[in-house]
């Protein structure tokens, strides 16, 4: 019986999401027959290292946000020689840095929206892109700190002054249409889901039960579904990801335009999360999904 440590919590703004993910994962792994213990991660890295000594057979990394999915904890685990789920240091750090990720995607010829990384003083003075456009942190997930600026919206300077996500912001063309997402397990795209939310698909819509509706499979033409799955796998490979990822898209029906927004190297594992839903749609129940992720990690050693 493998001994598995589940890392959950963390010190990012996505701590509560990680706690929910980690608890669900731990319960599923116990159901699948693993010897599981949970490590609630806080600011004391030494305590985490101590809790991982002696080393478990594998770590299920259920952390989200900075320090949990940006290559930091991955580097610690590599140093300790402990296999872990999801992507390694390089892929995790690149995916978390939206500017670096988009450079990789552009080099791979993947479809992107127009975008610019701008200093906050420049953002306060003028629009960096034609409106409507999106303002988002360079290195946060779960739609933390995301705003849409439309014609007539006078919040730009206020947003720049109140910004607490570093000295620059990612600005990106707002693509009208539908929100699509595709989960990938190594080289297999699972399904295409359309996310329907009232208004913007923000942090609350992502994680509050009933705040958004998931249509799986998405009601899009077969050619669009195939395109989204192909791009998701290509993005996973371009970043050098391992295990599970989830790629998010916008699709404009009127122009048949599909654009890749980002790749999530630590997809949510909460009751409303998309990866478990897509896996279930493909016949993989939640304990089996979690077990696959552990075995995928363990076999890399």
From Swiss-Prot:
UniProt cofactor note: Binds 2 magnesium or manganese ions per subunit.
Cofactor: Mg(2+); Mn(2+)
GO BP field: cell wall organization; peptidoglycan biosynthetic process; regulation of cell shape
The keyword Phosphoprotein is assigned to this record: no
Ligand binding (Mg(2+) 1): 248, 262
Function as written in the Swiss-Prot or TrEMBL entry: Cell wall formation.
Protein name per UniProt: D-alanine--D-alanine ligase
Source organism (scientific name): Acidiphilium cryptum (strain JF-5)
């Amino acid at each position: 019986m493998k001994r598995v440590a589940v890392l959950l919590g963390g010190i990012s703004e996505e701590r509560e999401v990680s706690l929910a993910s980690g608890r669900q994962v731990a319960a599923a792994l116990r159901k699948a027959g693993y010897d599981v213990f949970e490590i609630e991660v806080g600011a004391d890295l030494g305590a985490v290292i101590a809790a991982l000594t002696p080393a478990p057979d594998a770590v299920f990394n259920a952390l989200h946000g900075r320090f949990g999915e940006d290559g930091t904890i991955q580097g610690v685990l590599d140093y300790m020689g402990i296999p872990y789920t999801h992507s390694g240091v390089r892929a995790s750090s690149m995916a978390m840095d939206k500017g670096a990720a988009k450079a990789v995607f552009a080099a791979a010829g993947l479809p992107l929206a127009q975008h610019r990384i701008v200093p906050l003083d420049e953002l306060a003075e003028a629009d960096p892109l034609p409106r409507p456009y999106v303002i988002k942190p360079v290195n946060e997930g779960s739609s933390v700190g995301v705003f849409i600026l439309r014609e007539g919206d006078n919040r730009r300077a206020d947003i720049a002054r109140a910004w607490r996500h570093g000295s620059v912001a990612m600005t990106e063309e707002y693509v009208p249409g539908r929100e699509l997402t595709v989960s990938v397990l190594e080289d297999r795209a699972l399904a295409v889901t359309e996310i329907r939310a009232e208004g913007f698909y923000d942090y609350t819509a992502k994680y509050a039960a009933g705040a958004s509706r998931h249509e799986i499979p998405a009601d899009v033409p077969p050619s669009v579904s195939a395109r989204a799955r192909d791009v998701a796998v290509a993005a996973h490979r371009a970043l050098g990801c391992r295990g599970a990822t989830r790629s998010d898209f916008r699709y404009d029906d009127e122009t048949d335009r599909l654009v890749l927004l980002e790749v999530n190297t630590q997809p949510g594992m909460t009751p409303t999360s998309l990866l478990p839903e897509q896996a279930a749609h493909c016949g993989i129940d939640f304990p089996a999904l979690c077990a696959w992720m552990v075995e995928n990690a363990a076999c890399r050693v």
